[in-house]
Swiss-Prot record:
<keyword id="KW-0131">Cell cycle</keyword>
<dbReference type="InterPro" id="IPR007874">
    <property type="entry name" value="MinC_N"/>
</dbReference>
<dbReference type="GO" id="GO:0000917">
    <property type="term" value="P:division septum assembly"/>
</dbReference>
<dbReference type="Pfam" id="PF03775">
    <property type="entry name" value="MinC_C"/>
</dbReference>
<dbReference type="InterPro" id="IPR013033">
    <property type="entry name" value="MinC"/>
</dbReference>
<dbReference type="GO" id="GO:0051302">
    <property type="term" value="P:regulation of cell division"/>
</dbReference>
<protein>
    <recommendedName>
        <fullName>Probable septum site-determining protein MinC</fullName>
    </recommendedName>
</protein>
<dbReference type="InterPro" id="IPR036145">
    <property type="entry name" value="MinC_C_sf"/>
</dbReference>
<dbReference type="GO" id="GO:0000902">
    <property type="term" value="P:cell morphogenesis"/>
</dbReference>
<dbReference type="InterPro" id="IPR016098">
    <property type="entry name" value="CAP/MinC_C"/>
</dbReference>
<keyword id="KW-0132">Cell division</keyword>
<comment type="subunit">
    <text>Interacts with MinD and FtsZ.</text>
</comment>
<comment type="similarity">
    <text>Belongs to the MinC family.</text>
</comment>
<dbReference type="Pfam" id="PF05209">
    <property type="entry name" value="MinC_N"/>
</dbReference>
<dbReference type="InterPro" id="IPR005526">
    <property type="entry name" value="Septum_form_inhib_MinC_C"/>
</dbReference>
<keyword id="KW-0717">Septation</keyword>
<dbReference type="GO" id="GO:1901891">
    <property type="term" value="P:regulation of cell septum assembly"/>
</dbReference>
Amino acid sequence: MSASADHTFDIKSARLNLFSIRLRSTRLADITRDLDNRFSADSPFSRTPAMLDVSQVNPVELDYRGLVARFAQYGIHLVGVRPTPAGLEGALDDAGLLPLGGDEALDESRLEDEPQPQTLVIDKPVRAGQQVYARGGNLVVLATVSAGAEVIADGDIHIYGSLRGRALAGARGQRDARIFVRSMQAELLSIAGIWRTLEQDLPAALASRPLQVLLESDKIVMRALPD
């Protein structure tokens, strides 16, 4: 028997898709109030991992343990902080958070060598509990995405059936990514880590119409597609 056969586990590299929670306030009470207002009913999240983006606030003023507890109440499990705040390693350890480094720029020379994005086509329904990820390209779903299902793409997402679950476009930060949907009944929409839940019925001008979802000024907006 070889030495490797005696090992009880292997270590391999992996890429994980995480929501990014970009804080705009350091006041735990205000953040808690916003969570309550946005998710006063059932949260669309269930044990969903996310990272905390503290680039827009003073990280010294944050109650990290409190943030972990508050977001966990709504199914969002914070696993790390980015960019890593200097001198706060002890506070992160105490809250069970990992330092995830900074926002390093992409190496353009490497991008030139990367293959052109591919399109993943799914011709069957995506059912509750299933996740489909189009890594490095666009995703086309020719059927329905059920409630409790999740579709993710580094590029655009096109859904020719009903979207009743979650759709996350621009998963690697592509802010010009879009989501195109024939029938919008989504639990959650996300582009480049910025997300929005649909807690109310769509306006009459958008209901029962094919829609596109895009990012404008750090906000998710929906527009009807031309007839």
